């Protein structure tokens, strides 16, 4: 499909061998026509979503759109280095020790694992705290095969250790936040400085804090089962809103299934069984809205693969 441009404010970051479905491109073009949208960027993993595309970033002025962030605020990747030796890896033993981690953690269990509980967050009783969730969310142990730039890695990084990658989201909190705002205001943008915008931003921040805690709890319960510990090397959201500056203009950057390229180390996961890449973005890129792909993309809707 190539690194082509439609109007000057629409960019798709892809080469001639990248397959992107037509519906996703159509959604991107439609979204670019919303009032106050200045620029949009589609990533190589661009695909169609529920009305708005996934794998894209949108930059607007004076207004922002909760619907562009979607119903899983704060979904993202967290990466831990464990104390487990890669050379001594015994998958069957680790799987047996891990057992079932689909049951929500009680407040006592949360306190025992982290010394923190999710009770201060809205709807915390309904959020299945400490669980990964469905869809394409996962937690997986990884081994390091190749280090290309050791000088760019944290000093404590040890390629002889097993690494844990957790991909999880808001466990229903983002859905409840989005539903309330859509019921009250529809899909139109919220004016910055308005009461509606302030309410959403406060709830958005609470969701970001919750998902960070939840990913820590997921890792902590896994480490507890394996009788080991780990150090978090990064925790980066790919569904979120922030006020920032692009090309000298201050506005609102919406990322939906899109990894920030201006926050240090990030993980780009591959398809199941394929390689994932720990990368450090090295330069400011206005065309991509300082954003990278958040995964390998997909050719089919999840429902078609069941």
Predicted segments, located by residue:
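Domain-length cofactor-binding catalytic modules of enzymes
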Residues: 2-27, 35-41, 48-54, 58, ...
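Short histidine-centered catalytic/ligand-binding loop motif
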Residues: 80-85, 205
């Amino acid at each position: 499909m190539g690194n082509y441009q439609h109007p000057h404010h629409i960019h798709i970051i892809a080469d001639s061998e990248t397959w992107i479905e037509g519906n996703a491109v159509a959604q991107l073009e439609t979204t670019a026509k919303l009032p106050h949208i200045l620029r949009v960027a589609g990533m190589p993993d661009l695909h169609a979503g529920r009305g708005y595309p996934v794998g894209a970033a949108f930059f607007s002025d004076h207004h922002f759109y909760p619907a562009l962030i979607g119903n899983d605020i704060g979904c993202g990747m967290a990466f831990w280095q464990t104390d487990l030796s890669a050379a001594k890896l015994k998958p069957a033993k680790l799987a047996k020790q891990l057992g079932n981690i689909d049951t929500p953690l009680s407040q006592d269990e949360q306190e025992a694992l982290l010394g923190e509980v999710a009770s201060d967050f809205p709807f915390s009783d309904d959020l299945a705290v400490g669980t990964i969730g469905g869809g394409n969310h996962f937690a997986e142990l990884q081994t390091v095969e190749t280090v290309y730039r050791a000088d760019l890695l944290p000093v404590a990084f040890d390629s002889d250790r097993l690494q844990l990658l957790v991909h999880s989201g808001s466990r229903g909190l983002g859905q409840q936040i989005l539903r309330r705002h859509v019921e009250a205001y529809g899909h139109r943008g919220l004016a910055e400085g308005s009461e509606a915008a302030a309410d959403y931003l406060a709830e958005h921040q609470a969701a970001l804090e919750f998902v960070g805690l939840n990913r820590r709890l997921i890792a902590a319960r896994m480490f507890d089962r394996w009788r080991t510990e780990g150090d978090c090397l990064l925790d980066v959201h790919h569904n979120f809103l922030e006020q920032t500056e692009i090309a000298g203009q201050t506005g609102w950057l919406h990322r939906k299934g899109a990894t920030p390229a201006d926050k240090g180390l990030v993980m780009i996961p591959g398809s199941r069984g394929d390689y994932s890449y720990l990368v450090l973005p090295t330069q400011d890129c206005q065309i991509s809205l300082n954003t990278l792909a958040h995964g390998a993309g997909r050719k089919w809707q999840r429902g078609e693969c069941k």
